[in-house]
């Protein structure tokens, strides 16, 4: 049978958040929760952010100075490469023009918020003006809500977080051409 459509997945996502909160789990990031104070998850935040992240093991991904890389996913091929003294790297991608800005934006949306003014303090780009039409649309659609000088992603916005982030980066890329 076919999987659930986007609307049903959104409803399931919202229900999962309610269930986790009702069970007193603490939200660590867009996709990670903790039950006790000893539980941590820094990987996704740092791997998607501006920090270099060294990846080890089959299927792991990392970044160094903006260059992304993926370790071979096939365990047998990975073992053979390591045994032969070779790096088991499956692919490497060069950083795009706005990789730093993209990573800074990812750091925000990974933690369920958007703060164009904070990005403007880091980079000489008028993010607030550039993204104004999208932000106004998302406010009207209920995907984000004002939170002081920044915007908080609503549950619906959290569901669409990856696409919202990509849309903002697409606007940045198209405006710089």
Give the residues covered by each predicted segment.
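Short, amphipathic alpha-helical interaction segments positioned at domain boundaries
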Residues: 156-177
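C-terminal scaffold of the Radical SAM
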Residues: 1-125
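Short amphipathic alpha-helical interaction segments
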Residues: 124-140
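Short secondary-structure transition/capping segments
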Residues: 39-43, 141, 159
């Amino acid at each position: 049978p076919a999987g659930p459509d986007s609307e049903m997945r959104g409803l399931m996502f919202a229900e999962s958040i309610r269930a986790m909160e009702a069970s007193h789990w603490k939200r660590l990031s867009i996709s990670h929760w903790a039950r006790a104070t000893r539980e941590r998850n820094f990987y996704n935040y740092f791997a998607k952010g501006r920090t270099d992240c060294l990846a080890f093991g089959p299927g792991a991904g990392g970044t160094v100075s903006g260059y992304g890389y993926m370790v071979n996913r096939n365990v047998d091929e990975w073992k053979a490469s390591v045994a032969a003294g070779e790096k088991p790297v499956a692919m490497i991608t060069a950083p795009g023009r706005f990789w730093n800005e993209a990573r800074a934006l990812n750091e925000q949306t990974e933690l369920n918020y958007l703060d164009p003014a904070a990005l403007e303090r880091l980079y000489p780009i008028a993010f607030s003006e550039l993204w104004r039409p999208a932000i106004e649309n998302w406010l009207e659609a209920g995907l984000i809500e004002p939170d002081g000088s920044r915007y908080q992603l609503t549950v619906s916005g959290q569901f669409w977080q990856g696409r919202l982030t990509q849309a903002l980066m697409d606007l940045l890329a198209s405006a710089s051409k």
